[in-house]
């Protein structure tokens, strides 16, 4: 099989920006400004520069990435109000966290990812794009993690109930968990009600499609209503905030 062309021989950032504008316009998606499109174009270029080595996504064409990654990550802005600081659980190469960071430049977002090569890529993106108020947590988010946030979001395939348990210790009362799911999520919702109904209430369940496509989605949002005791640490587990700056640790000490 032939090798993919290097992305810099296909698009520069300005050309990618123009093509993104066409895609967003053709799909009736008008939430993104010129400067935000340029940042998304920069992110696309970084993804493609590292794609051959890392295989972050099976999507390579700009149009496909724009619809199935960029629009898919930020369309929830139409349907819900996000709470910050916001933790992206299992972000992979940065979805939905990086596009959301571009849309909310002044808000604090944390990217949780346990695969080291992805962590290094995320740090590279943060540096190359000069993204502020973006922390990268190089570990899996589980029940032993204590990173105080007001919201958690995930586009990962993990079961709703598992994620609710894993972020329990991170959320204050009233904190919200945003699940970006497919249309067949009903059984997960029923199981979560049975297992977690004492601690979370379902506050939103919105069915929608990506604009001008047949791709169906469900946004499922839970609000934390009750604390549960912190779990005992397993041997070898540490409750670390090692990726956060001392300033951030002090600022969040009030939570």
UniProtKB/Swiss-Prot annotation:
Transmembrane segments: none annotated. Keywords: Cytoplasm, Methyltransferase, rRNA processing, S-adenosyl-L-methionine, Transferase. Pfam families: GidB. It is an enzyme of class 2 (transferase). S-adenosyl-L-methionine binds at residues 90, 95, 155. It is found in: Cytoplasm. Residues 233-255 are annotated as: Disordered. InterPro entries: rRNA_ssu_MeTfrase_G (IPR003682), SAM-dependent_MTases_sf (IPR029063). Residues 233-245 have a biased composition (Acidic residues). Coiled coil: none annotated. GO terms for molecular function: rRNA (guanine-N7-)-methyltransferase activity. Residues 246-255 have a biased composition (Basic and acidic residues). The keyword rRNA processing applies. It catalyses: guanosine(527) in 16S rRNA + S-adenosyl-L-methionine = N(7)-methylguanosine(527) in 16S rRNA + S-adenosyl-L-homocysteine. The keyword S-adenosyl-L-methionine applies. One of its GO terms (cellular component) is cytosol. Belongs to the methyltransferase superfamily. RNA methyltransferase RsmG family. Specifically methylates the N7 position of guanine in position 527 of 16S rRNA. HAMAP family: 16SrRNA_methyltr_G (MF_00074). This is Ribosomal RNA small subunit methyltransferase G 2. It comes from Bdellovibrio bacteriovorus (strain ATCC 15356 / DSM 50701 / NCIMB 9529 / HD100).
């Amino acid at each position: 099989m032939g090798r993919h062309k290097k992305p810099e021989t296909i698009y520069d950032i300005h050309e990618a920006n123009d093509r993104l504008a066409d895609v967003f316009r053709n799909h009736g998606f008008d939430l993104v400004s010129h400067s935000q499109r340029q940042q998304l174009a920069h992110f696309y270029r970084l993804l493609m520069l590292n794609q051959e080595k890392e295989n972050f996504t099976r999507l390579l064409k700009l149009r496909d990435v724009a619809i199935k990654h960029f629009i898919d990550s930020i369309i929830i802005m139409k349907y819900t109000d996000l709470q910050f600081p916001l933790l992206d659980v299992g972000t992979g190469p940065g979805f939905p966290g990086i596009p959301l960071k571009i849309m909310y430049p002044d808000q604090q977002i944390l990217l949780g990812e346990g695969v080291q090569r992805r962590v290094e890529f995320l740090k590279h993106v943060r540096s190359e794009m000069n993204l502020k108020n973006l922390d990268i947590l190089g570990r899996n988010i589980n029940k032993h993690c204590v990173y105080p946030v007001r919201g958690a979001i995930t586009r990962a395939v993990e079961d709703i109930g598992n994620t609710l348990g894993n972020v329990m210790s991170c959320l204050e009362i009233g904190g919200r968990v945003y699940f970006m799911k497919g249309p067949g999520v009903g059984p997960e919702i029923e199981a979560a009600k049975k297992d977690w109904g004492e601690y979370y209430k379902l506050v939103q369940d919105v069915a929608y499609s990506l604009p001008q496509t047949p791709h169906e989605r469900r946004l499922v949002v839970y609000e934390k209503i009750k604390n549960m005791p912190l779990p005992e640490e397993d041997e070898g587990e540490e409750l670390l905030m090692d990726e956060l700056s001392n300033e951030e640790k002090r600022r969040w000490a009030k939570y």
